[in-house]
């Protein structure tokens, strides 16, 4: 019998192959039993609902109430424990949810460039955070709202039977497993190579009751869930209060505008993600270097530099190159640079799509000296706008059936994803075989003009981040 790890890898490869065979915008070739209710859980739900008393509720504390700061180290430790307890089925479920998140993320990324317009700065989007936010809302949804959310999450249903319904608890647990698999890899030497923290803020109008089972269910996705109440009648003031609260609690750069909200909004559902990746063997150059925003404009930016054997591929037909820089054994940073700066939009369309990971098979080892900007990026976006740009159903319109979240009238003002993304040097140890590289054969790769990037984890087949850098000093 093959070892469990080999069997798992083989099964994941099959999942990837099946996904690659799917055509069109919707991908249904998956073992959906991993994420839907089975007959046993349906029977348990039916028994639990028979004569069940009303779910207990509570009114969130005011936003000005004192709150302890988020302990990111403790968060990482919890994720490592989650990863350590995963069995084979858990890992398969995480891989499947990772792929579903990729498909949704690519679709939204491919369409919402119209919302951004021409990006002159830098921006970053998280497919897993988008999927997690929508799965969290699905946890609180009923009837047609739940149907629509299940459809956009990529899981079809044949009828109204329980066994066709997405199991929100399985999905949210799998999303936490996806995070844990990424973080745990860099902890073998007790030094965190990767940091990934997720915090959910549930902001309600004063007096609105939240159901306790809903908030408790969110803890399957992230242990830090912050329900708070505030007045939405002055939207600018409310946005400032939310920003101040989140920055005080997390210390991260955040962004809340409430642009899509109205004075009668009763809910802002916000997901905040902080990622920090340390590039092993890289160092920060002593002086800032030129980064060419276009043919005539440059800015001085901090640059990282490192040398090693990296996976690389140059596409001479479509004029772009890819360099894969490892964070850990299975997690990596993908750097995509057009050979000509004017081709950035074209290359983005070629690489950030559902079958884009196929070109990873073409990568091969190459001795490389890589120079690239040190990245500190912040991106915030309202999923209501992104889904509209992606021409998806009006899932997040203001009037939703969220009766598993609250029995009170819900009017959604904002569904925010806020990303704080950092890449920095880790000079503790050099990259592999640096001193053995034959200098004349070393390829110089310098990212001093617009480029694309992605953070990919093969262990969960998950693209955690997709980004575009036209100017490292400016957030789009």
Swiss-Prot record:
InterPro entries: Angiotensinogen (IPR000227), Angiotensinogen_serpin_dom (IPR033834), Serpin_CS (IPR023795), Serpin_dom (IPR023796), Serpin_fam (IPR000215), Serpin_sf (IPR036186), Serpin_sf_1 (IPR042178), Serpin_sf_2 (IPR042185)
Classification via CDD domains: serpinA8_AGT
Signal peptide extent: 1-24
Gene Ontology BP annotations: positive regulation of epithelial to mesenchymal transition; regulation of apoptotic process; regulation of systemic arterial blood pressure by renin-angiotensin; response to angiotensin; vasoconstriction
Positions glycosylated per UniProt: 38, 161, 295, 319
PTM summary: In response to low blood pressure, the enzyme renin/REN cleaves angiotensinogen to produce angiotensin-1. Angiotensin-1 is a substrate of ACE (angiotensin converting enzyme) that removes a dipeptide to yield the physiologically active peptide angiotensin-2. Angiotensin-1 and angiotensin-2 can be further processed to generate angiotensin-3, angiotensin-4. Angiotensin 1-9 is cleaved from angiotensin-1 by ACE2 and can be further processed by ACE to produce angiotensin 1-7, angiotensin 1-5 and angiotensin 1-4. The disulfide bond is labile. Angiotensinogen is present in the circulation in a near 40:60 ratio with the oxidized disulfide-bonded form, which preferentially interacts with receptor-bound renin.
Molecular function as annotated in GO: serine-type endopeptidase inhibitor activity
Keywords: Disulfide bond, Glycoprotein, Secreted, Signal, Vasoactive, Vasoconstrictor
PANTHER family referenced in this protein's UniProt entry, alphabetically: ANGIOTENSINOGEN, SERINE PROTEASE INHIBITOR, SERPIN
Protein name according to UniProt: Angiotensinogen
Species in which this protein is naturally found: Pan troglodytes
């Amino acid at each position: 019998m093959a070892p469990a790890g080999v069997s798992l890898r083989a099964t994941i490869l099959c999942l990837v192959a099946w996904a690659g065979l799917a055509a069109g915008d919707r991908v249904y070739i998956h073992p959906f039993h991993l994420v839907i209710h089975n007959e046993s859980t349906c029977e348990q739900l039916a028994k639990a609902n028979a004569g069940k008393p009303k779910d207990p509720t509570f009114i969130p504390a005011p936003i000005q109430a004192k709150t302890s700061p988020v302990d990111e180290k403790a968060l990482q430790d919890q994720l490592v424990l989650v990863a350590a307890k995963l069995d084979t089925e858990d890992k398969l479920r995480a891989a499947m949810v990772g792929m579903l998140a990729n498909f949704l993320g690519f679709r939204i990324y491919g369409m919402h460039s119209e919302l951004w317009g021409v990006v002159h700065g830098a921006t970053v989007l998280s497919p897993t955070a988008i999927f997690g936010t929508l799965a969290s809302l699905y946890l609180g949804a009923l009837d047609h709202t739940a149907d629509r959310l299940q459809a956009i999450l990529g899981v079809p249903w044949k009828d109204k039977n329980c066994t066709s319904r997405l199991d929100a608890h399985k999905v949210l647990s799998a999303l936490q497993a996806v995070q844990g698999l990424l973080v745990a890899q860099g902890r073998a030497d007790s030094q965190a190579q990767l940091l990934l923290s997720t915090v959910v803020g549930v902001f309600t109008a004063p007096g609105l009751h939240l159901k306790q089972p809903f908030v408790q269910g969110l803890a399957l996705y992230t242990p830090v869930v912050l329900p708070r109440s505030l007045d939405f009648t002055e939207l600018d003031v409310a946005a400032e209060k939310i920003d101040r609260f989140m920055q005080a609690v997390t210390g991260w750069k955040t962004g809340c505008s409430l642009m899509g909200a109205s004075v009668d909004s009763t809910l802002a559902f916000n997901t905040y993600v902080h990622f920090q990746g340390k590039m092993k063997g890289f160092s920060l150059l002593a002086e800032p270097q030129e980064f060419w925003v276009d043919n005539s404009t440059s800015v001085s930016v901090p640059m990282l530099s490192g040398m090693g054997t990296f996976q690389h591929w140059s596409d001479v037909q479509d004029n772009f190159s890819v360099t894969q820089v490892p964070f850990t054994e299975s997690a990596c940073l993908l750097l995509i640079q057009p050979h000509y700066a004017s081709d950035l939009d074209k290359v983005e369309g070629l690489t950030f799509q559902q079958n884009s990971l196929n070109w990873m098979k073409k990568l091969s080892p190459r001795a490389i000296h890589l120079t690239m900007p040190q990245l500190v990026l912040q991106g915030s976006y309202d999923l209501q706008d992104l889904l509209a740009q992606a021409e998806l159903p009006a899932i997040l319109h203001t009037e939703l059936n969220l009766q598993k979240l609250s029995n009170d009238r819900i009017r959604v003002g904002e569904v925010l994803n806020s990303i704080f993304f950092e890449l920095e040097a880790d000079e503790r140890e050099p990259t592999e075989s640096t001193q053995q590289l034959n200098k004349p054969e070393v390829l110089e790769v310098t990212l001093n003009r617009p480029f694309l990037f992605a953070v990919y984890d093969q262990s969960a087949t998950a693209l955690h981040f997709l980004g575009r850098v036209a100017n490292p000093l400016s957030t789009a």
